[in-house]
Amino acid sequence: MATVSMRDMLKAGVHFGHQTRYWNPKMKPFIFGARNKVHIINLEQTVPMFNEALAELAKIGSKKGKVLFVGTKRAASEAVKEAAINSDQFYVNNRWLGGMLTNYKTVRQSIKRLKDFEVQSQDGTFEKLTKKEALMRTRDMEKLEKSLGGIKNMNGLPDALFVIDADHEHIAIKEANNLGIPVFAVVDTNSNPDGVDYIIPGNDDAIRAIQLYLNAAADAVKSGRNQDVAAVAEKDGFVEAE
């Protein structure tokens, strides 16, 4: 499994925190100092903490666990979706609907509605409706897809959350905490690390930094899944001799 080096992090700007006046004192242990009134994150802590998180994600992947990638702010939205799709996992990248985890029974009903609409749009049902009815259903389907498209095939609660910006996604983190679902999160100098099981102290705004976290996390999950496939093949005697 690939690890992330300090050089990778420096190039992506992971070490740049927020302005000092916006800091959260709970992040003090992870701050190296300040430059031009901007906090500098101590990468000597971030590097091992992130690599430990990646090792744990690989472990979850090897057990066929489900990882939900969460990042709803504009800078993270597209990268979150890509990371989830690339690792065959799940995502929320538009808006976190309250109760997405803690009220999953209701969410499941909405997912069923979305899937019903998808079938109807393909099997000719929409064509039999009046233009107005068809338009209304199409709009409903698009709205549901935007909110739930990334979790429609999750089939139950995830085994872990990977979050970009602990502050912005505090509701998702709280719901995961209530259900005992482990949380991996990028926590900037203005955020509260409470409730995060695997803290990744780092810049949560720079697109290059966000892509670094997400690509590495997706690769870790994939490598874990591949290990599992290799182990099964070996057990069944399918491994080719070199």
Curated annotation (Swiss-Prot):
Q: Which UniProt keywords apply?
A: Ribonucleoprotein, Ribosomal protein
Return the InterPro entries for the record.
Ribosomal_uS2 (IPR001865), Ribosomal_uS2_bac/mit/plastid (IPR005706), Ribosomal_uS2_CS (IPR018130), Ribosomal_uS2_flav_dom_sf (IPR023591)
The UniProt entry's GO CC annotations, sorted and at most eight, read: cytosolic small ribosomal subunit
Q: Name one GO molecular function term.
A: structural constituent of ribosome
For the biological process aspect of GO, one term held by this record is:
translation
Family of this protein: Belongs to the universal ribosomal protein uS2 family.
Q: What is this protein called?
A: Small ribosomal subunit protein uS2
